[in-house]
Every structure is written in structure tokens, then in C-alpha cells.
Amino acid sequence: MAPPSEETPLIPQRSCSLSSSEAGALHVLLPPRGPGPPQRLSFSFGDYLAEDLCVRAAKACGILPVYHSLFALATEDFSCWFPPSHIFCIEDVDTQVLVYRLRFYFPDWFGLETCHRFGLRKDLTSAILDLHVLEHLFAQHRSDLVSGRLPVGLSMKEQGEFLSLAVLDLAQMAREQAQRPGELLKTVSYKACLPPSLRDVIQGQNFVTRRRIRRTVVLALRRVVACQADRYALMAKYILDLERLHPAATTETFRVGLPGAQEEPGLLRVAGDNGISWSSGDQELFQTFCDFPEIVDVSIKQAPRVGPAGEHRLVTVTRMDGHILEAEFPGLPEALSFVALVDGYFRLICDSRHYFCKEVAPPRLLEEEAELCHGPITLDFAIHKLKAAGSLPGTYILRRSPQDYDSFLLTACVQTPLGPDYKGCLIRQDPSGAFSLVGLSQPHRSLRELLAACWNSGLRVDGAALNLTSCCAPRPKEKSNLIVVRRGCTPAPAPGCSPSCCALTQLSFHTIPTDSLEWHENLGHGSFTKIFRGRRREVVDGETHDSEVLLKVMDSRHRNCMESFLEAASLMSQVSYPHLVLLHGVCMAGDSIMVQEFVYLGAIDMYLRKRGHLVSASWKLQVTKQLAYALNYLEDKGLPHGNVSARKVLLAREGGDGNPPFIKLSDPGVSPTVLSLEMLTDRIPWVAPECLQEAQTLCLEADKWGFGATTWEVFSGGPAHITSLEPAKKLKFYEDQGQLPALKWTELAGLITQCMAYDPGRRPSFRAILRDLNGLITSDYELLSDPTPGIPSPRDELCGGAQLYACQDPAIFEERHLKYISLLGKGNFGSVELCRYDPLGDNTGPLVAVKQLQHSGPDQQRDFQREIQILKALHSDFIVKYRGVSYGPGRQSLRLVMEYLPSGCLRDFLQRHRARLHTDRLLLFAWQICKGMEYLGARRCVHRDLAARNILVESEAHVKIADFGLAKLLPLGKDYYVVREPGQSPIFWYAPESLSDNIFSRQSDVWSFGVVLYELFTYCDKSCSPSAEFLRMMGPEREGPPLCRLLELLAEGRRLPPPPTCPTEVQELMQLCWAPSPHDRPAFGTLSPQLDALWRGRPG
């Protein structure tokens, strides 16, 4: 056993078994540091928070506060984990044994290539864990293996792997104890480092075999000890090898049930590298539901059961596109264990300030929230934030110490003769909970009181006066060293600040011809528009499609606002969400006309005026929550709306008969950034106060203010009295930081007050707003709706039936509910249409892309079914998502249903936005496409049609591979296949062996990827496209078929020319991809880190 150190617990160690006879005690076991029993901390009678116990254990193990969030407490058999907020009550006869373990895992912990902690610059990133955590993780893994907790196989190969792990274990012991291998093996048996089942196998061998195995271990141990690797490198190797052998050890699986049914239980699996997956029954084939950044909210409710099963809990996870996963857990502890796991991963990956529900919220985080205190961020991030705030003297940041659990750090900006400087003060918290700061005469009961005492205390730090004036409070989604960046996962969108600065708001929309529009009655006027009801008619393949539309005509008197009006149209045309109004396009004939879907019940403010007291509080809560979902979607995209009010919220479905109401947020219209002060004053109280201060930028926080005012309007049944005041009195209301009258529901009034905080930095994120609304919906606020006895209240659904249960596959779309909207694309083999799947017939269903064949012969149907099966099996951030299929009558026809990405294909996107897409963005796209192709290759899938036209754009920073019509799966045991019926092919993207012999492989896809790189860096300019360049090389008097001439050119070594602005390193990669021999081309797994390194090395 290792000698005592400063990490050894101060409490004496006694029994560590659940069967301990000691009464009235709680024991927290720590992983053993070597052979022997585990260390433990013991606590006597009283109440203990799980998070406080974790802090005590972290201090004993030397775990710093930065890494505290990786750990949690579990029962001794690991059947249940406890959220940080759990309270353990120890009474006279109780004895509880807990285990302190690292719960949150990430792929390839070590180094910076796969995952790392966020840094201000790409060269300032740091590893996820430090040496103390590494040591703890090693002890945890080693204990699991040698105790028999991990299931192990006993094939000859696996026996060799475990013997290798034993050698690494012995080598690190030799390093720690400074012993030679021979000396170590006199006191420690190599079999003590093996799983029990393998120990038994070896013990059952004859003497000669046991001696041979021991000699092999000794020789291997001498070789390892002779190398230069230190103890920590040996530990890291041990951990990586064990996680490679047992990847399930880094995931957690939960057995769940389908609500309202008595079927076989399903399985939920949570993993740090890909989020939540599910499987029906006991099948081990898991389907991905969502990654952590896609989660919008999580809620826990009592399951709708009666009788003995009343303890069951229903957990609902809502993802960004509106689909939900509902899973029924046998009890509250299991449900909280699952939610705490998802909650913890979300904080580590997405937002260190967020928690999904109060039942699992870490108490230390709640304390930080109340005190406007940051977590244990480093000094670099604190100074960076003060600089971003303008480096104003007196601004300060309060943060937890990254080194000490009982200390806080005050970092403030002070004025010196040389300019602004940054000084720090240490705040200590004593065991009684009092806070003290050197220079203050007495301790204070809270941080808030201590800081108030600092404001006019005359404190000096290093000779500089410390006069605090304003606090830089924590903000949602702030990037810091507390965030883990996972390479190869969907990039988080950057915070949006202004439509003019936002990527998606570049003018880009579908143009609608005048003769396709039919005008009906006038519906009134907007601030800048005349509004008409109308009809849009489109003819596709001789078939006429009619859609009822709303026509917004820009008033000619407001020509100066035309650009902002078109920016709003562009924004709405490039987003797709159930609770956002669909924009068909813009008609530019004479006046600018925005063509939108027609929402039948109109604006919700008018509806509330008509219905008055007949509208229940429960109905209003659901409407408010749906609005929050829409604004959360825009917030995640970094897109401010800027004009949130009840008149912009349209009611698509009234609700009733078990269905909830359904709203859609309309376009923002003209942005506040171009309006005069008089017009902005007219929008009080919906416009945020900062928008009146001649600001030329519109930030996301403005929408929180508008949401608060709209929520007040919805629950009050009409606009606030302030709307009828004179302009001067309205402005005075803002100058005095007035508040709207408080609603009678205290919690809702508090939420509105938070949203309408005059300091934009104090307003909550929409995820936090949704969390608080969930608390209202699942509380006694439902009683206010006064439902009729015997009639069930409407479900709290996001998208009107778009649910995904843990044990149910929602892959069949009824053809009659697919409503055609427009044609997205048409090729030689099929067409893709934009449709709305609308089973309720009220235009509330989700938008989807639907692919169907042009010709439906038996061969085409077979190939189409193969394409569907391939896409269905793929789950990657960089491949378009499969949604399901739709069958015609008698299953005579088949359609593929996919996610709809409104930004279109990469080819058109590059052509439209060439001026603002710089090299770093092109490299990001290239890396993402390469990662997607690497994923396909690992699944033996050859795409065969990789080109920019078949890459779809989800956002300014995210692309996905699509169109698997030509894709093939490689036969087992083969690295290529030969196409017998090649048909029409994109020859200018094909490798030589594909052109001459119809041979396709992962290497032929690499050739096509080289052509895609060429397309990226030429911005898909038609004048220098691959086909145009090769035809130019062939000359005007070319003889024979183009394919033969192309083969001759390639055999002569002719290749596409280097694009003018392409970096030399990318040109070299292109040439490697175009090597004549397939074996000389790099694999996607080799190209991916090279492109990643190029992208990370670019400025910005």
C-alpha cells in the first residue's frame, strides 16, 4: 500500500462493508490507491448534502474545484447515483455506505486532439483532467477490474490484453515505490492485478504453464520499466487500454418502461461522446436520440399509473427540433439518477450555469446564482471578461477559487497612472460560514454583505484604490475552462448580437413569381405593411399545388426600411421550427411582398380580447412555453428576433379534445436598430430599454425583455396601461426603471421580473425560462384551469404529437398527412420536396424534406430501399438525419422522409455568400465533411456521389452529407466492390479506377473528397467547376466520349488547377487525394486531424 500522504483522510479507517455493525454512521469510500482495502471518510449523526460530501472527499483526494463536477456519489453496488442536492439523513440505527467516483467520462481523455477544456486561444487549451484526477481514475478503473465488477471474456486474445494491463499496473507500482521489478514481485503477485475469473483460470493451469506465464510477465515488466515513460503515462495507457476493451464502462444504461403500457422494458444509454441513445426491449442495437447540445429541457413527473406502481416517475427530454423522449422509471431515485447524469454532462459541455430542474440542481451553483458569483474560472477568463466589459474602473468579478474549496476571489479593474489594471483579493469562508477579507474590520454573514462593505471602505490593493462600482455577473453559455470541447461533435453556435452581424441574416430567400399569387381580401395594416389574404399556385410535373398564404406588402412610404424588411424575410427563410411561421419566399415585382403561410386564428392578443376570462391559466402557460421554445431555438442559432409581442404570436390551433393550443411566432418585421426614437417609444413596454439608447446592434437579451412583456400581456388579457401614456411618460417609465404591475401568481411574476431586468446581463436564458415554466406547469397552477370533471386536460406537448418514446420507433409517416409546400430539388433519378407532416390538419406539424423516385421500376425501388436502409443506420452530426418513410396505397410507392435544412446545398450556399466565407470557414466545412466520410468508412459505406451539391448546410458553421442514392455497403472481407450497372455517373468527381473498371472503395471516395476541396476553395464558381475545367482541358475539338478523354487526361497526370486563394497545405492534400493508385491516397482518418490542425491554426 502507498505510504500515508497529505491526501490520506484524517478520519480513522474502519470497516468498509455494507454489513458493518456500526450504527448511526455514513461512510464514503474512496478508490484504493493500491492493493488493499479502499480509504473512506466517516460521518456521524446528522443531515449531509451529497455535494458537501463530494467536496469533503475531493479535499481528501486532492481533487481541485475545477474538476469537482466530474465526480458524484453512488451506492456501493453502483445501482443508483445521487444528485448533488440529495440529503442523507443519518439516524441512530442507520448505516449507509457510499462510493465517491468519477461519473462523467469523455473519449480519449489525454492530450488535446479529441477533447479538451476551452481556452481563450487555440494554443491555451488544457486537458480535461490533471494528475490527481488521473490517479483517481486509474485507481477507480483498477479497482473495477481486479474486483470482478467488469464482465470480462477469457479468449486467448483477451487473456493477453489483461496480462498487458497487469504489466502496466505493476510498472506504475515500481515507479511509485522506486523498486526494481524483481523486488516488487517479491511482495506483489501479478495475479493480484488480474480480474478474478482470469486468476482462477491461471490457478487451474499446471505448474509449467503458470511458470511460463509468470516469466512472460516478468520479461514484459522489465521492458516497460526500462522505457522512459513516467508513472502517469503508464496510468494513462492503462486507462485508455481498459476503456478500449470495455467501452461500456464509460457509459450508463437505464432500464425504463413505455408510459401507459405493460411491455418489455426499454433501455436508455447516456455517453459523454454522443448523448442519449435508446433501444426497445433488451436489444443492444441503440438508436441515437440526441446529443447534449440538442436538449432544450428535461422534466420529471409522476407517471400516470394507479395502484402499487404509484412511485413510478415519467422523465421527458425535449430536443431542439421538438421531438420528445418519454421514459418511465420505477421510482424517483432512478429518475433523479438519470436526470442528474444528463444535467451534469450538459453543464460540462454546453453551459456551466444551467440546470434542467431544481430537483438535481447543485447547491453550490444555486449559491453562486444568488451571489452573482462565477464558478472556479481561471484569472485569464476573469480578466478577459472585464476587458470585454470595457475595462471600466470599479467593475469586478466574483469567482470561486480554482485551488481551494473554501475561498473566493475578487478580481477588479482599477485605475493606475499607466492605465487600467486588474487586481485580486482573496475572500475566505470559515467553518461557521462567515466571509472575511483582509482590510475589512470584521467578517460578514454573506458575500453580498461583504461586497457591500467594500464599496466605500477605502480598500487598497498593491497601492491602488479599490472602489467597486458594478459587478460583471455570470452569463448563460459563457465559455471558460469549465467547458469541455469535444472534437468531432456539432459546434456550438456563437452568441448572436445583431441581425446585421449574424450569418443567417444575409439576404437569401426564395423568389416567388407574381403570376403564381392570387390576391384576396385585405386583413389590415402593420406598422410598415399592408396585409392581404391570398393563394399561391405552383405547377410541378403537370400537377397543381395550392397553398393559402398571407401577403405582406411593404408600404412605399417606408422605402428607407426596405433592407431591414428583406433581412427579416431572409432570416425566416433560413430557419425551420414548428413554432415559427413558414416563409414561402418574397415577390419582388414592384413592391416587396413577403409570402408567408396563413395562420387561421390570427394574433393571440386579438384572440384573448375576444375570449377574455374563458381562457384558462393552464392554456396560457402552454402558449407561453411554446413561445419560449421558439425563442430558445433562435437563441441557440444566435439570431435575435427583436420584435416579440402578443401581436406577433399567431394561434394555429385553439386546443381542446385532449390537444393543446399551438402558436407560431411571426417574422420580426423592421428591426429596432433602424427605427426612430419616436417609433421605438411607441413599442414600449415590449422593446428592451437598451434598444432606445441609439444602439446599432440588437442582442439576444432584448428578446428576453420582449418575452417578459408578452407573458405579462397574455396573463393580463391585454396590453399594459403604459401603452396608452404619452411618449414622454413612457420614456420616464424606463428612466425610472419602472416595472409592470405584478401578477397575482408569485412565481410567474418573479419570472417576468427576471426577464425584464434593466441590466441585460441579469436576464435568464430561454432554457432557464423553460425550466421555470416547467415548474409552474407541473405544479398546482394546473388547478387554475378548472377542467371539466371526467375530461382529460390537454397534454403539454411541444409540436402537437411529435413525441418519441423510449420504446417506440416513429418512422412511419402517413402519406395523406404530408402536405406539399415547395420543390427543393430535382435530379435524374428523383425529386425532393418540402412538406409539412400535419396529422391534425391545422398546419402545426413539423417541416420535413421528402424524397421520391421519378421512375419506380423494380430495380429503382430496390435501390431506393437500400438507400433508406443505409441512411436509417447512420447517426452522425455530419450526416443528414433520417426521419422515416411514407408508403402509398398498397405500399406501391415509397418516399423517404428526412430532416429539412432550409439553407440548402453547399454549392448554392457558397455561391450566395462567397464574400463573407473566409478560409477558416471553408476549412471547418472541409473537416466536417471529412469527419462524416470517416464515419461512413468505419461502417463500410462508400458514398459514390460526394460533391458540394450533395452537402447540405444546417448553419453558418455546420454542414451535413446527404444523398445516398448511389451509396453501397462493402461486402465483408472486401475493401472494394464492382458496380455491374453503373448508369449515369458524376464522372468528373470519380477516381480513375471507377471510370475504367467501375471499382468503388473508400479510396475512391477520397478522390471525390479532393474534388470537393477544390469546389470549396473555388466557391463552386460555375466558370471553373470540375466539369468546366476538364472540358476546357479536352479542347473544343475533342474526339470520342468524354469519359475516355477524361481517363486519358488523368493518365497523363493532368489534374484540376489549384484555386487562386487556396492555402498551399490544402493544395497538397488535394494532390494526395488524387494519387493515381488508390493505395497511395490518405485515409479519411488521416486527413481529418490534418484539416483540424489547419483550421485550428487559422486566425479567428
UniProtKB/Swiss-Prot annotation:
The modification Phosphoserine is found at S17. The keyword ATP-binding applies. SUPFAM superfamilies: PH domain-like, Protein kinase-like (PK-like), SH2 domain. Its EC number is 2.7.10.2. InterPro entries: Band_41_domain (IPR019749), FERM_domain (IPR000299), FERM_F1 (IPR041155), FERM_F2 (IPR041046), JAK (IPR051286), JAK1-3/TYK2_PHL_dom (IPR041381), Kinase-like_dom_sf (IPR011009), PH-like_dom_sf (IPR011993). It catalyses: L-tyrosyl-[protein] + ATP = O-phospho-L-tyrosyl-[protein] + ADP + H(+). It is an enzyme of class 2 (transferase). PROSITE patterns: FERM_3, PROTEIN_KINASE_ATP, PROTEIN_KINASE_DOM, PROTEIN_KINASE_TYR. Its main location: membrane. It is a peripheral membrane protein. It comes from Mus musculus (Mouse). Autophosphorylated, leading to regulate its activity. IL2 promotes phosphorylation on tyrosine residues, including autophosphorylation on Tyr-781. Dephosphorylation of Tyr-976 and Tyr-977 by PTPN2 negatively regulates cytokine-mediated signaling. Belongs to the protein kinase superfamily. Tyr protein kinase family. JAK subfamily. Interacts with STAM2 and MYO18A. Interacts with SHB. Interacts with CD69. Residues 517-777, 818-1100 form the Protein kinase domain. One of its GO terms (biological process) is positive regulation of extrinsic apoptotic signaling pathway in absence of ligand. Non-receptor tyrosine kinase involved in various processes such as cell growth, development, or differentiation. Mediates essential signaling events in both innate and adaptive immunity and plays a crucial role in hematopoiesis during T-cells development. In the cytoplasm, plays a pivotal role in signal transduction via its association with type I receptors sharing the common subunit gamma such as IL2R, IL4R, IL7R, IL9R, IL15R and IL21R. GO terms for cellular component: cytoskeleton; cytosol; endomembrane system; membrane. One of its GO terms (molecular function) is protein tyrosine kinase activity. This is Tyrosine-protein kinase JAK3. Possesses two phosphotransferase domains. The second one contains the catalytic domain, while the presence of a pseudokinase domain is required for suppression of basal activity of JAK3. The keyword Kinase applies. PANTHER family: TYROSINE-PROTEIN KINASE HOPSCOTCH, TYROSINE-PROTEIN KINASE JAK3. The active site is at D945.
